[in-house]
Amino acid sequence: MSLLTAVIAFLFISTFCSGKFPIYTIPDKIGPWSPIDINHLSCPNNLEVEDEGCTTLTAFNYMELKVGYITSIKVDGFTCTGVVTEAETYTNFVGYVTTTFKRKHFRPNVSACRAAFSWKTAGDPRYEESLHNPYPDSHWLRTVTTTKESLLIISPSVVDMDAYDKTLYSKMFPNGKCFPPISDSPFCSTNHDYTLWLPEKEKLSMSCNIFVSSKGKKATKDGRLCGFVDERGLYKSLKGACKLKLCGMAGMRLMDGSWVSLQRADAPEWCPPGALVNVHDFHSDEIAHFVVEELIKKREECLDTLETILTTKSISFRRLSHFRKLVPGLGKAYTLINNTLMEAEAHYKSIREWKEIIPSKGCLKAGGRCHPHYDGIFFNGIILGPNGDVLIPEMQSSLLQQHIELLESSMIPLRHPLADSSAIFRSDNEAEDFVDVHLPDTQKQVSDIDLGFPEWKRYFLIGVSAIALFSLAIIIAVCCRKFKRRKRPKPGPIELVRKVSVTSQSGKVVPSWESYKEGATSQP
């Protein structure tokens, strides 16, 4: 099978089989056979719309995935954590103030979070001031508690958005998924009970910058939409398409895995959860342009073969493979029966595995049954080999498997959830560590003596207190001295008489009359 055939079969398919790519086209409806002259041979024009006779073309604009679009949509946002800082102060008798800081949390509201985020992004000093610890108040011999609420903003905080349903994914969300859904709520809850995640842009649709407007032509028959010719000139059938919204935009997923913002009156079913879309990257765009070039080239090769047949007046079954319809849709099939050229109307479909048309040895399934052969010749160059195997010329192409692998590599899912049950954002016990990195320290502080007075009043009070203490000390000393004097015992009357002193005739002092008397009698 040529490279063109593989690409064409991939881009134009009419039946769905998950996980496989089309590799060939074969009639699902064929016959009856009728003899023709070689002059009636014609090459199929695969660029023309021939699917079910839908030949009416109308110009229109449509949306498709932007070229270069990456698989995951990144949404910028920020987290908002409500923090209450509590300052507890106690002033003792001598004026020492002890301050102890404690930290608690509260669940913030969305409007306050957006206001704080605006302050931070604008460089408003009010945001930094709001994070400072509260200025502690104090009263003598009292415990005073001062609280201050702050909103801690951490940005950027980038999450992944699923383009299919706008679901947000991040390991910071419970179970890795935003809840409540961002379409129903302006915020997402996180693994930290007091932290909210909000998108930087309130309108999440602004994050879905993945579409581009293209021009094409609708193919209709009697007002019924069959398919369209895209901007690159390729016809795409709507057979087997299913409804799918990307970033809230309604559209259809075609059977080749592409997405287009088309809708039909006879709306198809919604796509199953596993039906993803192809990434529209530069490589796939190059393939699309390459297909158009190859279609033209293959038509030229077919015309060259037709010219050779008409010139030589001879034909072989191998040359008939050039006249096969390369894309699903209406066409013709050719064969040789009893050395007579035969033609039949046919409707081609795509297949993804060879066993779909070769279910068993010697059986070529076409039109819902094993198609009969005539002297080992089926049609379109397909023959029965000497050992009874069905031989298809395109099966021998060395480029086929390489191109199938190339097509498979371009089928990349959009869904990239970051949910990891083992990676919890923060547990309750780690909440302090979460906010302490971004807020001032809350260690215990003890101030100097502070009675709450201004500077001059404090020194005045100290001076007055010193004078008062000095005066009080003097008063206490005087009072103590007087008190001690009053406590001495008074002498009796006899002791007073005994202690009276007299002076003798000799001029000596005699302590008492009795002493004088005793001294006088003792003299000779």
Curated annotation (Swiss-Prot):
Job of this protein: Attaches the virus to host cellular receptor, inducing endocytosis of the virion. In the endosome, the acidic pH induces conformational changes in the glycoprotein trimer, which trigger fusion between virus and cell membrane. There is convincing in vitro evidence that the muscular form of the nicotinic acetylcholine receptor (nAChR), the neuronal cell adhesion molecule (NCAM), and the p75 neurotrophin receptor (p75NTR) bind glycoprotein and thereby facilitate rabies virus entry into cells.
InterPro entries xrefs: PH_Rhabdo_glycop, Rhabdo_glycop_CD, Rhabdo_glycop_FD
Topological domains annotated Intravirion: 481-524
Region annotated Disordered, chain positions: 504-524
Species assigned in the record: Irkut virus (IRKV)
Note: Arg-352 is highly involved in rabies virus pathogenicity. Its mutation dramatically attenuates the virus.
First and last residue of the signal peptide: 1-19
Encoding gene (name): G
Main location (coarse class): virion
Family: Belongs to the lyssavirus glycoprotein family.
Stretches assigned to the Virion surface side: 20-459
PTM info: Glycosylated and palmitoylated by host. Glycosylation is crucial for glycoprotein export at the cell surface.
Places the protein is found: Virion membrane
Lineage, opening ranks: Viruses, Riboviria, Orthornavirae, Negarnaviricota, Haploviricotina
Name recorded for this polypeptide: Glycoprotein
GO annotations of cellular component type: membrane; viral envelope; virion membrane
Practical applications: Primary surface antigen capable of inducing and reacting with virus-neutralizing antibodies. Almost all human and veterinary vaccines are based on the functional aspects of the G protein.
Lipid-binding residues (covalent, S-palmitoyl cysteine): C480
Positions of glycan attachment: N338
